[in-house]
Amino acid sequence: MHKRTAVVLAAGKGTRMKSRQPKVLHEVAGQPMICHVLDALTDCGVAQPIVVIGHGGEAVRQRLGDRACYAWQQEQLGTGHAVMMARPEVPEEVETVMVLCGDTPLLTGATLSALWETHEQSGAMGTVLTAVIDDPKGYGRILRDDAGHVTAIVEEKDADEKQKTIREINAGTYCFDRAALFAALDAITPANAQGEYYLTDVLAIFRQRGGLVVAHTLQDEREILGINSRVQLAEAEAVLQDRLRRKWMDAGVTLIDPPSVFFHTKAVVGADTIIYPQTIIEGETVIGEGCRIGPATRICDSRIGENVVIQNSVVLDSRIGDDCAVGPFAYLRPGTCLAEAVKVGDFVEIKKSVIGKGSKVPHLSYVGDATVGEDVNIGAGTITCNYDGKHKHVTAIEDGAFIGSNTNLVAPVTVGAHALIGAGSTITKDVPAGALAVERSRMKIKENFLGRKHKGSQ
């Protein structure tokens, strides 16, 4: 195999995005579009491509970190100029250089691998990724000779009327022989309507020098979609979501209403899980087998066990064990950990707490900064009062305890194993194991009170 590297062009301003954020950092399927490009390159064995940065370059470098090395293009003078800026970063031992854009998140690793194979097997100086589309307006057109070899690429603004009728277009991704590429870059000039150094001009130079230029034609034209506007961003999102939905359905996941379910590209879902409408799976979430998720549920950066039911709920950065039931209308905040067979019911909020095996928080409760043992029942309306206005404090509820409805547990406080808290209590002291704790005023009944009140008002 030839020694390879890739140059990713990511220096543009993205003016039509109307955003302060660099264009390539806008997200598709939950991650910046340039990360999709780097993922595809990783699939091809390129672990650290060269990313050419300019507008918002520091933000791009901060986001990508050591996934890439970087070259600066301080002035945006065209694609050819961008590759010139990357030249010092290309190792001497590299034989083949791929050049592609950072705003093409739909390109797959399989397509890039096929492009590389076509290039290296042909012995060409340059290979162009192309597509045949119905409406080629705005794209550079591919010019071929009688043998079918590429002779040149003419940009839309420089094309004559005959050339504009050509439907085969440049997808903006190339493979080059390293030595031929940099020799040709030394010869290009900005003699065009844009006054820029076009990378595509090197292809004509290859031909003039007796080199071969070939094309690799895409079967799925959607892969070439570049993103220059919010509309195109939404179009790319739709294409990638369709891919992800098909991927998981092919893996044994049932989607009741596929168009209404959204996946992060890094999410993982087990077989025989059913996902109901209006559900969003974000971040590096892992969902086990045999679960029922949704409807109207959002799960982000969480690990869900097997045979879990989550209905109409929000789960953020949490861990849920096997056979749990969550919702409807529950809110699991970061740091929540549910052991096996836990029930969290309607209108329950849990934050930074561990709930033990078989325990239940059925409804209308807040549990924060707490450790709850096994087989605990927390009655409706229970609140762990964890905040004193300055610090957070921990509530500990040990195995088998029963917390009556409408209880306030004022932390720091411990409820011992198998203790019983009477309904309506406010607990401010530790409760020993096996004890009964009741803290409430004695009930008073005033008979005929309503009648006296009415009589006195006459």
UniProtKB/Swiss-Prot annotation:
<feature type="region of interest" description="N-acetyltransferase">
    <location>
        <begin position="252"/>
        <end position="458"/>
    </location>
</feature>
<dbReference type="InterPro" id="IPR038009">
    <property type="entry name" value="GlmU_C_LbH"/>
</dbReference>
<feature type="binding site">
    <location>
        <position position="228"/>
    </location>
    <ligand>
        <name>Mg(2+)</name>
    </ligand>
</feature>
<feature type="binding site">
    <location>
        <begin position="386"/>
        <end position="387"/>
    </location>
    <ligand>
        <name>acetyl-CoA</name>
    </ligand>
</feature>
<dbReference type="GO" id="GO:0000287">
    <property type="term" value="F:magnesium ion binding"/>
</dbReference>
<feature type="binding site">
    <location>
        <begin position="78"/>
        <end position="79"/>
    </location>
    <ligand>
        <name>UDP-N-acetyl-alpha-D-glucosamine</name>
    </ligand>
</feature>
<keyword id="KW-0677">Repeat</keyword>
<dbReference type="GO" id="GO:0019134">
    <property type="term" value="F:glucosamine-1-phosphate N-acetyltransferase activity"/>
</dbReference>
<comment type="pathway">
    <text>Nucleotide-sugar biosynthesis; UDP-N-acetyl-alpha-D-glucosamine biosynthesis; N-acetyl-alpha-D-glucosamine 1-phosphate from alpha-D-glucosamine 6-phosphate (route II): step 2/2.</text>
</comment>
<comment type="pathway">
    <text>Nucleotide-sugar biosynthesis; UDP-N-acetyl-alpha-D-glucosamine biosynthesis; UDP-N-acetyl-alpha-D-glucosamine from N-acetyl-alpha-D-glucosamine 1-phosphate: step 1/1.</text>
</comment>
<feature type="region of interest" description="Linker">
    <location>
        <begin position="231"/>
        <end position="251"/>
    </location>
</feature>
<keyword id="KW-0548">Nucleotidyltransferase</keyword>
<feature type="binding site">
    <location>
        <begin position="9"/>
        <end position="12"/>
    </location>
    <ligand>
        <name>UDP-N-acetyl-alpha-D-glucosamine</name>
    </ligand>
</feature>
<comment type="similarity">
    <text>In the N-terminal section; belongs to the N-acetylglucosamine-1-phosphate uridyltransferase family.</text>
</comment>
<feature type="binding site">
    <location>
        <position position="170"/>
    </location>
    <ligand>
        <name>UDP-N-acetyl-alpha-D-glucosamine</name>
    </ligand>
</feature>
<feature type="binding site">
    <location>
        <position position="103"/>
    </location>
    <ligand>
        <name>Mg(2+)</name>
    </ligand>
</feature>
<keyword id="KW-0511">Multifunctional enzyme</keyword>
<feature type="region of interest" description="Pyrophosphorylase">
    <location>
        <begin position="1"/>
        <end position="230"/>
    </location>
</feature>
<feature type="binding site">
    <location>
        <position position="380"/>
    </location>
    <ligand>
        <name>acetyl-CoA</name>
    </ligand>
</feature>
<dbReference type="GO" id="GO:0006048">
    <property type="term" value="P:UDP-N-acetylglucosamine biosynthetic process"/>
</dbReference>
<feature type="binding site">
    <location>
        <position position="333"/>
    </location>
    <ligand>
        <name>UDP-N-acetyl-alpha-D-glucosamine</name>
    </ligand>
</feature>
<keyword id="KW-0460">Magnesium</keyword>
<feature type="binding site">
    <location>
        <position position="23"/>
    </location>
    <ligand>
        <name>UDP-N-acetyl-alpha-D-glucosamine</name>
    </ligand>
</feature>
<feature type="binding site">
    <location>
        <position position="377"/>
    </location>
    <ligand>
        <name>UDP-N-acetyl-alpha-D-glucosamine</name>
    </ligand>
</feature>
<dbReference type="GO" id="GO:0003977">
    <property type="term" value="F:UDP-N-acetylglucosamine diphosphorylase activity"/>
</dbReference>
<dbReference type="InterPro" id="IPR018357">
    <property type="entry name" value="Hexapep_transf_CS"/>
</dbReference>
<comment type="similarity">
    <text>In the C-terminal section; belongs to the transferase hexapeptide repeat family.</text>
</comment>
<dbReference type="Pfam" id="PF12804">
    <property type="entry name" value="NTP_transf_3"/>
</dbReference>
<dbReference type="GO" id="GO:0009245">
    <property type="term" value="P:lipid A biosynthetic process"/>
</dbReference>
<keyword id="KW-0961">Cell wall biogenesis/degradation</keyword>
<dbReference type="InterPro" id="IPR011004">
    <property type="entry name" value="Trimer_LpxA-like_sf"/>
</dbReference>
<keyword id="KW-0808">Transferase</keyword>
<dbReference type="InterPro" id="IPR005882">
    <property type="entry name" value="Bifunctional_GlmU"/>
</dbReference>
<dbReference type="GO" id="GO:0008360">
    <property type="term" value="P:regulation of cell shape"/>
</dbReference>
<feature type="binding site">
    <location>
        <position position="366"/>
    </location>
    <ligand>
        <name>UDP-N-acetyl-alpha-D-glucosamine</name>
    </ligand>
</feature>
<keyword id="KW-0963">Cytoplasm</keyword>
<dbReference type="InterPro" id="IPR025877">
    <property type="entry name" value="MobA-like_NTP_Trfase"/>
</dbReference>
<comment type="function">
    <text>Catalyzes the last two sequential reactions in the de novo biosynthetic pathway for UDP-N-acetylglucosamine (UDP-GlcNAc). The C-terminal domain catalyzes the transfer of acetyl group from acetyl coenzyme A to glucosamine-1-phosphate (GlcN-1-P) to produce N-acetylglucosamine-1-phosphate (GlcNAc-1-P), which is converted into UDP-GlcNAc by the transfer of uridine 5-monophosphate (from uridine 5-triphosphate), a reaction catalyzed by the N-terminal domain.</text>
</comment>
<keyword id="KW-0573">Peptidoglycan synthesis</keyword>
<keyword id="KW-0479">Metal-binding</keyword>
<keyword id="KW-0012">Acyltransferase</keyword>
<dbReference type="GO" id="GO:0071555">
    <property type="term" value="P:cell wall organization"/>
</dbReference>
